[in-house]
Amino acid sequence: MAAEIIDGKAFAAKVRGQVTEHVTRLKEEHGITPGLAVVLVGEDPASQVYVRSKGKQTVEVGMNSYEHKLDADTSEADLLALIDQLNKDSEVHGILVQLPLPKHLDEDLVINSIAPEKDVDGFHISNVGLLGTGQKSMVPCTPLGCLMMLRDYHGSLSGLDAVVIGRSNIVGKPMAQLLLGDSCTVTIAHSRTKDLPEVVRRADIVVAAVGRPEMVPGDWIKEGATVIDVGINRIDAPEKGEGKTRLVGDVHYESAAARAGAITPVPGGVGPMTIACLLANTVTACCRANNLSEPEGLTA
């Protein structure tokens, strides 16, 4: 059987359309424009690309975009002072500090200085705790995007067996919490899990977020399972020419697609959903800040 391809680009466009509708409604009915502030420290090329893309998409959905670009040698005190200023700014509903930060800055300290209600990345320890106890929180963008795609494909996830491969604070752990919240039976697996192939073969849903190129072969996948591949790995591609590379996920796509019922490609699967969910979180944060009903379909 050939798996159905879950098109992340198309789904992200749908989410951005929903965000645009909510932003328009907030402007017309309440005179409120959601605002997202992105802080970039240093000149990391990949981070610069991400920040430009976030700013562009923020404006396209009708929100205000505030970019703060700081020198790589910016002191921790100056960065914390900027975040404090943004925390107090009523025009700013979401704050994102682009990671990684230069080594002299304490990432945990910086992230936890963001007001939890404006932490649209969902990394603040308060949001982590709220998610872990099943309470209303800001949810990390990548797991939220995965959950949206799974709900769209399956409808109800209740009772399904899910395996999350990877235990990071950014994807693995929050993904498991979200699946638990939707009444899945969840296993968190990782590189040291005993008999990992058999663990994965039992799963109706496989979320791979371990950061190892093509680690999961197709024969680990249960017939008809849904595969969400969060991995983005660049590997050599000599078939394209000397020095050429290509992007692959944590799952071997061709062999997995032959067995799965549905699968996300890399690229074009989970990746586009991350920024779309950042925009969704910003609208959610804006609604909460103004005691308005939250947008349906854009939250966990």
Swiss-Prot record:
Protein name: Bifunctional protein FolD
Gene Ontology biological-process annotations: L-histidine biosynthetic process; methionine biosynthetic process; purine nucleotide biosynthetic process; tetrahydrofolate interconversion
Residues annotated to bind NADP(+): 166-168, 191, 232
Function, as annotated: Catalyzes the oxidation of 5,10-methylenetetrahydrofolate to 5,10-methenyltetrahydrofolate and then the hydrolysis of 5,10-methenyltetrahydrofolate to 10-formyltetrahydrofolate.
HAMAP family in the cross-refs: THF_DHG_CYH
Pathway: One-carbon metabolism; tetrahydrofolate interconversion
One Pfam family recorded for the sequence: THF_DHG_CYH
UniProt keywords, alphabetically: Amino-acid biosynthesis, Histidine biosynthesis, Hydrolase, Methionine biosynthesis, Multifunctional enzyme, NADP, One-carbon metabolism, Oxidoreductase, Purine biosynthesis
The enzyme's E.C. designation: 1.5.1.5, 3.5.4.9
Assembly information from the UniProt record: Homodimer.
MF annotations from Gene Ontology: methenyltetrahydrofolate cyclohydrolase activity; methylenetetrahydrofolate dehydrogenase (NADP+) activity
Domain of life, source organism: Bacteria
Catalytically driven reaction(s): (6R)-5,10-methylene-5,6,7,8-tetrahydrofolate + NADP(+) = (6R)-5,10-methenyltetrahydrofolate + NADPH; (6R)-5,10-methenyltetrahydrofolate + H2O = (6R)-10-formyltetrahydrofolate + H(+)
GO cellular component: cytosol
The keyword Hydrolase belongs to this UniProt entry's keyword annotation: yes
Family as reported in the entry's similarity comment: Belongs to the tetrahydrofolate dehydrogenase/cyclohydrolase family.
